[in-house]
């Protein structure tokens, strides 16, 4: 395995260094080829490294950054005041080639804006999208995007997301000729926003996309599609609703029947069922798939859930490792060239999808 270096915005997220630093040490234990640049306030980070051994310390470096992008700051405001923040410094390390990827649990809008400003979108991509790979009930995986980078999306952006999602599903997840669907409130052609209906018409005429139509949110985990495309507002709400339901379900499995007097054989049966069902559905635990890749950039950026615990943030670090090893930006760029000639974007003129040059 080739050595690689990641930049961590350790100050971001709801819990900051108290979660991100222990997660960094956990990631170092799991990967002997990994070096981490911990970006943040040295006075806060250093005490949290007290338990790190000599070998771990040899693969750690603290990069000073005294300020933090506020979680409630407007993206435009956060970008203007971003100089010297842990998020911006971490992204600059990627831009300068000192790190191969950035991981942050900070403000999503600010991360998207700064990443677009510093790392630049790929040719033919208007705006990057947050993407994750979710497990489904057929024991396969579904690529879902956008998960919150772009609240309002027009039809062209949705088509671009579909192209990127299909490339990711085929090149990284290993799904041949992946099925692509648009998330909508119904399967009928007349349902949904204008942008969704327009994107549907455009996708039907893109020969490189195996477009299968609309999919409703209740079928997200059924395995009916390999790529599910939506705007960032809808995607974020859908993902967090699903995460909440899964957490409640797993919690109920553990607590069901506690405090009630039962026969010994009923207690044994209950415990066996709890363990069996927990194993069966544990792959749906949100902590196990934390970390959304900001797809469509010339560099690798992973957005962790802001409320991630140590285990979940360590998973986000591993997501960054895999994205770098699989050369996700390079593969996306290479495939986009075969779909859109350099400097062009899709345009629906009523006769199918043509191409027009960026102005």
UniProtKB/Swiss-Prot annotation:
InterPro entries: FA_synthesis (IPR003664), Phospholipid_synth_PlsX-like (IPR012281). Pfam families: FA_synthesis. GO terms for biological process: fatty acid biosynthetic process; phospholipid biosynthetic process. Keywords: Cytoplasm, Lipid biosynthesis, Lipid metabolism, Phospholipid biosynthesis, Phospholipid metabolism, Transferase. It catalyses: a fatty acyl-[ACP] + phosphate = an acyl phosphate + holo-[ACP]. Pathway: Lipid metabolism; phospholipid metabolism. It is an enzyme of class 2 (transferase). Its EC number is 2.3.1.274. Homodimer. Probably interacts with PlsY. Catalyzes the reversible formation of acyl-phosphate (acyl-PO(4)) from acyl-[acyl-carrier-protein] (acyl-ACP). This enzyme utilizes acyl-ACP as fatty acyl donor, but not acyl-CoA. PANTHER family: FATTY ACID/PHOSPHOLIPID SYNTHESIS PROTEIN PLSX, PHOSPHATE ACYLTRANSFERASE. Belongs to the PlsX family. This is Phosphate acyltransferase. It comes from Salmonella heidelberg (strain SL476). The gene is plsX.
């Amino acid at each position: 395995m080739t050595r690689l270096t990641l930049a961590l915005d350790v100050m971001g997220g709801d819990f900051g260094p108290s979660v991100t630093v222990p997660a960094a040490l956990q990631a170092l234990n799991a990967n002997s080829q990994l070096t981490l640049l911990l970006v943040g306030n040295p006075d806060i980070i250093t005490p949290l490294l007290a338990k790190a051994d000599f070998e771990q310390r040899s693969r750690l470096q603290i990069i000073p950054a005294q300020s933090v992008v506020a979680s409630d700051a407007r993206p435009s405001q956060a970008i203007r005041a971003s100089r010297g923040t842990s998020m911006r410094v971490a992204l600059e390390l990627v831009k300068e080639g000192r790190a191969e990827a950035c991981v942050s649990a900070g403000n999503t809008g600010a991360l998207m804006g700064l990443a677009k400003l510093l790392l630049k979108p790929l040719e033919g991509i208007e705006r990057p999208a947050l993407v994750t790979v979710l497990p489904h009930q057929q024991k396969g995986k579904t690529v879902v995007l956008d998960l919150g980078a772009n609240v309002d999306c027009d039809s062209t952006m949705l088509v671009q997301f579909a192209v990127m999602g299909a490339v990711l599903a085929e090149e990284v997840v290993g799904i041949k000729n992946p099925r692509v669907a648009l998330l909508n409130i119904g399967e009928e052609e007349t349902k949904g926003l204008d942008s969704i209906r327009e994107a549907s018409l455009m996708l039907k005429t893109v020969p490189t996309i195996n477009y299968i139509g609309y999919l409703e949110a209740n079928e997200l985990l059924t395995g009916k599609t390999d790529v599910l495309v939506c705007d960032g507002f809808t995607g974020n709400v859908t993902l967090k609703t699903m995460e909440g339901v899964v957490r409640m379900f797993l919690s109920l499995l553990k607590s069901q029947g506690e405090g009630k007097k039962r026969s010994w054989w009923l207690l044994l049966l209950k415990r066996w069922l709890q363990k069996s069902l927990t194993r069966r559905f544990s792959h749906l635990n949100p902590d196990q798939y934390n970390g959304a890749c900001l797809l469509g950039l010339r560099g690798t950026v992973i957005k962790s859930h802001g409320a991630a615990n140590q285990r979940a943030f360590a998973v986000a670090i591993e997501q960054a490792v895999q994205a770098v090893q699989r050369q996700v930006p390079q593969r996306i760029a290479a495939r986009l060239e075969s779909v859109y000639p350099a400097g062009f974007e899709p345009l629906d003129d009523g006769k199918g999808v043509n191409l027009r040059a960026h102005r």
